[in-house]
From Swiss-Prot:
Glycans are attached at N134, N267. Forms homodimers or a heterodimer with TAS1R1. Keywords: Cell membrane, G-protein coupled receptor, Glycoprotein, Membrane, Receptor, Signal, Transducer, Transmembrane, Transmembrane helix. Expressed in taste buds. This is Taste receptor type 1 member 3. Residues 852-865 have a biased composition (Polar residues). It is a multi-pass membrane protein. Residues 595-606, 664-685, 754-765, 816-865 are cytoplasmic. Residues 840-865 are annotated as: Disordered.
């Protein structure tokens, strides 16, 4: 293309002229900050800065003198110029149209920034703002504004431009207040909100285990808002701020004494990490004092505003402050930008080119806003080389493409051109700025509902080199932090990652007991059994569910296993052996009694009733089989009835025999004979039946009124769930024993004081000892059952039943078995039947005399008296 060839030749000649002029040569670079077009974009850039800041020092509204030069501000302005020229030279966005630009210096001062802002809002073709009731048809000099760079300035200009609904796109203002659409409806930016940067900072602190930090901000809108956001989010995430303060502005402020006190507190505490959310000027002030006070090396988490600032990087003594980390927004590479800057400088040094600018752009209105950028006309490539790759350059560049895309949509441009129509007014452009998607250098961007863009961050680390540190990428933040630990290095003693915690991390199974006002200062307390530590930051132990358990210092709960009196337990096996013994003895005695059923001994013991009592005693022994194993509803209901009814049957036979002995010894002979006849006849079985019916009625009442049920007790055992039969009323449980206790008591009363005749079998003694065995076992049962662990209560009841049965067998039945087996010569009517033998002596004698052999003894119960 001949135009590009001519431009390249001109740039080459200009570059030669620039080298010939040297460093002190004057150029016309400031004149390149303005270009006419169909639509003009205003620009606010920090091309310089003033020595004294603030309005309090002046008594008159005089002009602020900007003496310092900012190379970054000029580079951002040149990036906007480059973007406009690319759009004008291309046909993708605004074919047939030319954008213009009008770029001014803000001097980093709100008062200075307002002057060009007023010029921007002047009516097209004039230098003043007309007063109207309705500005709908008002056409200002600019269609949109790019800038300013700082939050402090954007808060001032943002309200001003929002009144006219003029779109404003900042390339550096990040305070979250600017996202408020109620106050700043026309504000947009190509940098993320501070809220995103703060979230990245907090996640970095969490990832590195730093929860005891100091937080410092600059005493301006950017620092105060950022510090407020950080404090709120850090507290919500369990990060404690040990010290907090503001760096006063300007540097000569009388409040710097408070800053020195803050630095001394940080130096004397265990804080090893300082979050510094401030402007570059405030950061330089802080580090100047920290170097002077010889603050020990710390880790400085930097905000984006000062992380790449030459004001801070070039401060003498900075390598001794420690490690500096911070987040920078990502952007698309701009490899052509350094070449473009060199070309602009070369052209600015060309007198012919400068003369052409004077002819094309007469009257720069310097009488209104002052010199546009006098320092720019003395700049050299060496002055700008350090900031050529600054990350914010792309943000300024992308801002132009965002406005151009919205204008493209407003004009409904296509490949052939943009349809002619009335000039677009700022408020019409604003309608198409909301949620607009655009591309800059291949990177897709979009303004969201709050005017922010979705740009990710790189985590940068200062690696100290001479003269300024190198920025090394050690991680990224794309909604979540990704840290590259292998790339990190620590400028601290020992080159080890510093620890910044008020208290050590609690061990597993411990929770924090906060001491003082900071949640990060705490004592570690063990979680007791039955509770556990759910999360490392828990302040209280979490109780396990009732079906779970945990040991001391646990981090989880375990399921409780059901526990009951299992068949395989040693105690149960011992009781089963005892059962076998008792049942074996009862069956052996029953068999022996049946074999000798007609003998005087068996007849004296009750005959069939004695066999019935032994059978019931065997059933009593078998009832213990209902206690082992997992309890069920049926087994719980059957335990007491199946034990008490057989025992009642056994004791009722004893009662009849005791009554017979009592009658024979205590009543007159005539009455005794009558009563014996009744006690030995069919009426005796009626007594047994009535006793068992009475016990059955008690058992039925017990099961209906207070039915035992299967319950699972979760707390009685430390690691298991006890499954057992629960007794609702111990009074009713005792009343079920009433029938048996009464029978045993009557037996004892009827036999205790009875005297046997010499040479006769003492049947009363066996009954007395049998009842004593009953009472001893069941009286011992009460305190033992009440004090033993509930898990072993079924075993206690089993043992009591078996001991009771064995006691009855040992005191009443086994002595008779001994006589049957070892002393058969005593098994005679004279020894056992007493009065019956005397009453029927002739019958016994005749029977034995006639046959000469032993005769069958008649049943004393059924034989005639």
């Amino acid at each position: 293309m001949p135009g590009l060839a001519l431009l390249g030749l001109t740039a080459l000649l200009g570059l030669t002229a620039l080298l010939d002029h040297g460093e002190g040569a004057t150029s016309c670079l400031s004149q390149q900050l303005r270009m006419q077009g169909d639509y003009v974009l205003g620009g606010l850039f920090p091309l310089g800065s003033a020595e004294g800041t603030g309005l309090g020092d002046g008594l008159q509204p005089n002009a602020t003198v900007c003496t310092r030069f900012s190379s970054l501000g000029l580079l951002w302005a040149l990036a906007v110029k480059m973007a406009v020229e690319e759009i004008n030279n291309g046909s993708a966005l605004l074919p047939g149209l030319h954008l213009g630009y009008d770029l001014f210096d803000t001097c980093s001062e709100p008062m200075v920034a307002m002057k060009p802002s007023l010029v921007f809002m002047a009516k097209a073709g004039s230098c003043s703002i007309a007063a109207y009731c309705n500005y709908t048809q008002y056409q200002p000099r600019v269609l949109a504004v790019i800038g300013p760079h700082s939050s402090e300035l954007a808060l001032v200009t943002g309200k001003f431009f929002s009144f006219f609904l003029v779109p404003q796109v900042s390339y550096g203002a990040s305070t979250d207040r600017l996202s408020n659409r109620e106050i700043f409806p026309s504000f947009f930016r190509t940098v993320p909100s501070d809220q995103v940067q703060v979230a990245a900072m907090v996640e970095l602190l969490e990832e590195l285990g730093w929860n005891w930090v100091a937080a410092v901000g600059s005493d301006d809108e950017y620092g105060r808002q950022g510090l407020s956001l950080f404090s709120g989010l850090a507290s919500a995430r369990g990060i404690c701020i040990a010290h907090e303060g503001l760096v006063p502005l300007p540097p000569g402020s009388l409040r710097l004494g408070a800053l020195q006190g803050l630095l001394r507190q940080v130096n004397q505490s265990s804080v090893q990490v300082v979050v510094l959310f401030s402007s570059a000027h405030a950061a330089r002030t802080l580090f100047s004092y920290s170097i002077r006070c010889k603050l020990s090396p710390k880790v400085w988490v930097a905000s984006e505003a000062w992380l790449t600032s030459d004001l801070v990087m070039t401060l003498p003594g900075m390598p001794g402050v420690g490690t500096v980390l911070g987040f920078l927004q990502q952007g698309a590479p701009m490899p052509e930008f350094p070449s473009y800057v060199r070309t602009r400088l070369a052209l600015a040094a060309d007198p012919a080119f400068c003369a052409s600018l004077d002819a094309e752009q007469p009257g720069l209105e310097e009488h209104v806003v002052g010199p546009r950028c006098p320092q720019c006309d003395h700049v050299t490539l060496e002055n700008l080389s350090a900031g050529l790759l600054h990350h914010q350059t792309f943000a300024a560049y992308a801002a132009v493409y965002g406005v151009a895309q919205a204008l493209h949509n407003t004009l409904r441009c296509n490949a052939s051109g943009c349809p002619r129509r009335e000039p677009v007014r700022p408020w019409q452009l604003l309608e198409n700025m909301y949620n607009v998607s655009f591309r800059a250098r291949g990177l897709a961007l979009q303004f969201d509902a709050s005017g922010n863009v979705n740009v990710d961050y790189d985590l940068k680390l200062w690696v100290w080199q001479d003269p300024t540190p190198e920025l090394r990428t050690v991680g990224t933040f794309k909604g979540r932090l990704e840290l590259w630990r292998s790339q990190m290095c620590w400028h601290t003693p020992g080159k080890q990652q510093p620890v910044s915690q008020c208290s050590r991390q609690c061990k597993e199974g411990q929770v924090r007991r906060v001491k003082g006002f900071h949640s990060c200062c705490y004592n570690c307390v063990d979680c007791k059994a039955g509770s556990y530590q759910r999360n490392p930051d828990d302040l209280l132990c979490t109780q396990c569910d009732q079906d779970q358990w945990s040991p001391d210092r646990s981090t989880r709960c375990f399921a409780r296993k059901p526990m009951f009196l299992a068949w395989g337990e040693p105690a149960v096996l011992l009781l089963l052996a005892l059962l076998a013994l008792a049942l074996g003895l009862a069956l052996a005695a029953l068999g022996l009694f049946l074999w000798h059923s007609d003998s005087p001994l068996v007849q004296a013991s009750g005959g069939p009733r004695a066999c019935f009592g032994l059978a019931c005693l065997g059933l009593v022994c078998l009832s213990v089989l209902l206690f082992p194993g997992q309890p069920g509803p049926a087994s719980c209901l059957a335990q007491q009835p199946l034990f008490h009814l057989p025992l009642t049957g056994c004791l009722s036979t004893f009662f009849l025999q005791a009554a017979e002995i009592f009658v024979g010894s205590e009543l007159p002979p005539s009455w005794a004979e009558k009563m014996r006849g009744r006690l030995r006849g069919p009426w005796a079985w009626l007594v047994v039946l009535l006793a068992m019916l009475a016990e059955a009625a008690l058992c039925a009442w017990y099961l209906v009124a207070f039915p035992p049920e299967v319950v699972t007790d979760w707390r009685v055992l430390p690691t298991e769930a006890l499954v057992h039969c629960h007794v609702h009323s111990w009074i009713s449980f005792g009343l079920v024993h009433a029938t048996n206790a009464m029978l045993a008591f009557l037996c004892f009363l009827g036999t205790f004081l009875v005297q046997s005749r010499p040479g006769r079998y003492n049947g009363a003694r066996g009954l007395t000892f049998a009842m004593l065995a009953y009472f001893i076992t069941w009286i011992s049962f009460v305190p033992l059952f009440a004090n033993v662990h509930v898990a072993y209560q079924p075993a206690v009841q089993m043992g009591t039943i078996l001991l009771c049965a064995l006691g009855i067998l040992a005191t009443f039945h086994l002595p008779k078995c001994y006589l049957l087996l070892q002393r058969p010569e005593l098994n005679t009517p004279e020894f056992f039947l007493e009065d019956n033998a005397r009453a029927q002596g002739s019958s016994w004698g005749q029977g034995r005399g006639e046959s000469g052999q032993k005769q069958v003894t008649p049943d004393p119960v059924t034989s005639p008296q």
